[in-house]
C-alpha cells in the first residue's frame, strides 16, 4: 500500500493512544526507516500538564499499522 500526504488513515497499532482513530498523513519518509509515516491528529494525547491543552498530535507509524480510509484529493 502506497500512502501519500493528505490521505486519511485509521490506526491499527493496538498499543497506540490513537488506536482506531483516523488521522491525516503529514509525510512519508523514503529513506527506509522503521516508522516512515507521520500521521497528524485533530486532538492531542495525554502529554502536557494540568490546566494546559498542550500535548502531542503527531506520531510515526509503519505502513502495515495503517488502514487507508480516504485517499487525498488530487
Curated annotation (Swiss-Prot):
Gene Ontology CC terms: photosystem I reaction center; plasma membrane-derived thylakoid membrane
Any Pfam family hit: PSI_PsaE
GO terms, biological process: photosynthesis
Key word Membrane present: yes
Thylakoid keyword on record: yes
Alphabetical UniProt keywords: Membrane, Photosynthesis, Photosystem I, Thylakoid
Subcellular location: Cellular thylakoid membrane
Gene3D superfamilies to which the protein is assigned, alphabetical: 2.30.30.50
InterPro entries: Elect_transpt_acc-like_dom_sf, PSI_PsaE
HAMAP family: PSI_PsaE
The family this protein is said to belong to: Belongs to the PsaE family.
Matching NCBIfam families: PRK02749.1 (NF002745)
Protein name as catalogued: Photosystem I reaction center subunit IV
Species of origin: Synechocystis sp. (strain ATCC 27184 / PCC 6803 / Kazusa)
Gene: psaE
Amino acid at each position: 500500500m502506497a500512502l501519500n500526504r493528505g490521505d486519511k488513515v485509521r490506526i491499527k497499532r493496538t498499543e497506540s493512544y490513537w488506536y482506531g482513530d483516523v488521522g491525516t498523513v503529514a509525510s512519508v519518509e523514503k529513506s527506509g526507516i522503521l516508522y516512515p509515516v507521520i500521521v497528524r491528529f485533530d486532538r492531542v494525547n495525554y502529554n502536557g500538564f494540568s490546566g494546559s491543552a498542550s500535548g502531542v498530535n503527531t506520531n510515526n507509524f509503519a505502513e502495515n499499522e495503517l488502514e487507508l480510509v480516504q485517499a487525498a484529493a488530487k
